[in-house]
Amino acid sequence: MMVDLFKVDTPRRAVLAAIAAFAAMPVLAATPLKVVATTGMIADMVRQIGGEAVVVRGLMGAGIDPHSYRQTRSDIVAMTRADVTFWHGLYLEAPMEEFLADWDRKSSVYAVADNLDPAQLITHADYDDSFDPHVWMDPVIWAQCTSIVVDELTNLYPEMRTLFEENASTFVQEAVALDAYSRDTLMKVPPKSRILLTAHDAFGYFGKAYNFDVLGIQGISTESEAGLNRISELVDILVDRKVPAVFVETSVSDRNVRALIEGAAAQGHDVSIGGTLFSDAMGVDGTYEGTWLGMIDHNVTTIARALGADVTARGRLGKLAGAA
């Protein structure tokens, strides 16, 4: 049975039993670090780096939109009991920005994107002096976010520095391999079909990394509204460029995407839904798609197949249930 170390009334015996499970590791000086992470992508990264030296609680699960999420009472309780909280930054968790800034004055709170070089970021069209926050869509950039996690876990648990650094190195190597797979797979899409149209503009870094034209019905934030002019403009693009497929997202309504399909059909061009992509949230916990690696593998494989590439539905490691 999983021991919930975030509960203040967790029996001491249960905590000791959990620690005993680390027998194959160096002797731990304390109980595992209690970590809170806002998004699933960050929670997955911290679990991969921290291993059994951390217990991670993610605030936003599968299908949850971070652009509109607000902290709950249970979130605040978890953060109160945590040793450290990691959030994304770059205005991703916009409704929580003020709360997190205030929390930072009384607890350990760190934005994993803080150390990224602005030169590699995409300017945010909706806000002045801001950037597109969806950096996890580019494996090379996302791997750089491990540095803050390693530094802060090590500050709290210096005895486990080697574990954290080795796990982070493994994470980076996996990210590099995923980037290579993505590049090779997406090159199989015919050049004229390299157009990715989704519910909102979350795939800018994907497009920049893999030479795709990326179009979102809504802006970078799902809080922006799509007007009739935008829908009409995108319908014309679908028809003119004979785009075969568009994509829905797990954390965004498909209403606008279906309006596009209907608009294109009215002009005599059939467009299908190429599949469901993970944009701002990963898949269900406990599944391959419920990890960052699985999330990106699924997206790349789904996009490639829907746009004409002859690639396996099982993905990079053969772990996908089948792109859909």
Language model region names:
Residues 3-7, 30-324:
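Extracytoplasmic metal-acquisition and chelation regions
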